[in-house]
Amino acid sequence: MTLNIGVIGTGAIGQDHIRRCSFALSGAKVVAVNDINLEQAKKVVNDLGIGAEVYADAHELINAANVEAILVTSWGPTHEEFVLAAIKAGKPVFCEKPLAVTAQGCKNIVDAETAFGKRLVQVGFMRPYDQGYRALKAVIDSGRIGEPLMLHCAHRNARVGQAYATDMAITDTLIHEINVLSWLLDDHYVSAQVIFPRKSARALAHLKDPQIVLLETAKGTRIDVEVFVNCQYGYDIQCEVVGETGIARLPEPSSVQLRSEARLSNEILVDWKDRFIAAYDVELQDFIDAVGAGRLTGPSAWDGYTAAVTADACVAAQGSGKVEPIVLPERPAFYAPA
């Protein structure tokens, strides 16, 4: 059985997903494409030779009779509108982050999906599909290091563009840790604080960089995340879990160890897409397979909502310098883990 997919948004990630569905993954075919830049959408379809119909209107694509599932990879502020339209049409929808640009927007999607009565939404948080994070979670869940007490994490980028602002360290960068660490611990956050160390001379004038985000979970686990987006040396993701009886670390990406000229070295990646490229394939294949099975199990609209609420608290903490509470309603049974 082949799942007919419509893709809204043909920017970089949209093009990547179209290629995945068309040439790398199984059980899916891109039959419809839309973008606000209609000529770009036509060019993508022609360049890839996929024969998909190009729609000028995203809502027409969503409601097209031959489109069975939707991928939303358009500009972030449009996500809520298109996801709600997909739910109304009763069609499964994979939405790249953010699910919506506000916590209330995410809650609107949660409410619409629960009213529909069936999970239709998967959010594009890819790290739970990364082999390294899955291995780390397996160690935690096995009890081999006892209960997790502390996590020491880092999210480092070589550099960022002029448009990158201080709050984007939360909304664009930390958001991945917000999601994956909650999944890793099977826990939710109750407070956030942000500390600004000495500013790097390499940071843009308007940007506070690095930042340290301190999170506390409902079970009492303490998490510190260093966000440093001008580290210069590469793209580097670190996660160390300190348990009662041992420590577990996220494995480094596989690379050749080089002994040469009196040095022992390993390559460090520079592009985030290279670091998690396999996870992108796995998450989208999971969505395709889950739609075929009639039951979505990946990151949910509830996960998107809780990430947005947590991010809002972190941004508030950036401004206040205080420990900000993170207040979440109880997770509905509708979103209980499968």
Curated annotation (Swiss-Prot):
Its EC number is 1.1.1.18. The keyword NAD applies. One of its GO terms (molecular function) is inositol 2-dehydrogenase (NAD+) activity. Pfam families: GFO_IDH_MocA, GFO_IDH_MocA_C. Keywords: NAD, Oxidoreductase. It catalyses: myo-inositol + NAD(+) = scyllo-inosose + NADH + H(+). Gene3D superfamilies: Dihydrodipicolinate Reductase, domain 2, NAD(P)-binding Rossmann-like Domain. InterPro entries: Gfo-Idh-MocA_inositol_DH, Gfo/Idh/MocA-like_OxRdtase_C, Gfo/Idh/MocA-like_OxRdtase_N, MI/DCI_dehydrogenase, NAD(P)-bd_dom_sf. GO terms for biological process: inositol catabolic process. HAMAP family: IolG (MF_01671). Belongs to the Gfo/Idh/MocA family. Involved in the oxidation of myo-inositol (MI) to 2-keto-myo-inositol (2KMI or 2-inosose). Homotetramer. This is Inositol 2-dehydrogenase. The lineage of its organism: Bacteria, Pseudomonadati, Pseudomonadota, Gammaproteobacteria, Pseudomonadales.
